[in-house]
Amino acid sequence: TPTPPTKPTVTEFKQAGYNSPKGTVSANLATATSDGAKYTYQYEGKTLDITLPNIKAGTVVSSTDGSGLTTVVGGSTYSYSRFGAVFSANHESPSEVFSVGVPTSNMPTTGSAQYKGLLLGDGMTSDRQAFHTQFDVSFANKTLTGTGNTVDGTKVYEFRDGKIAGNAFAGVFAHPAAETAGTFAGQFFGPNAAELGGYAHAED
């Protein structure tokens, strides 16, 4: 049995240099058309190829083009999705985080599942941070909840009241530094909801 590849680490995300000006981060979902298709993301009128099929498991790739646009991509350990961030060197354009994948077409309707991965984010006190995440999903009840934890296991973020509709989901995102709760949304990717990805936002 092959050894499962390691996931990208918090340190690797920091080294990739993700940092965006406070208050300008937006978040979006994009999709790949089919299993094995090219993963692309639209940013400021540009189509970015974030497929990166030859990157090694457990790594995060950061690349900057001639215009100073930097793209940070993780998800090399996943078969049906990618996630990351894109920002300009001079911060003239808004920074964005993204989740891209092959949407699930055969959603489970019974049972439950637990997903573990990473959250990449930016905030007033947590520029270019990544956290470990865990989501508990009930396909029978069409609900999900989750947490975002530091390396030592301290809970920092909470995803609650998540509702599943088709292959998509949405709910309440709670951040201790935010004045009010925000929102999170996402999709399941791959056959039988093999993976999930999405974004969250809360105002400081």
What is each of the regions a protein language model found here?
Residues 1-204:
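Mature soluble binding/inhibitory domains
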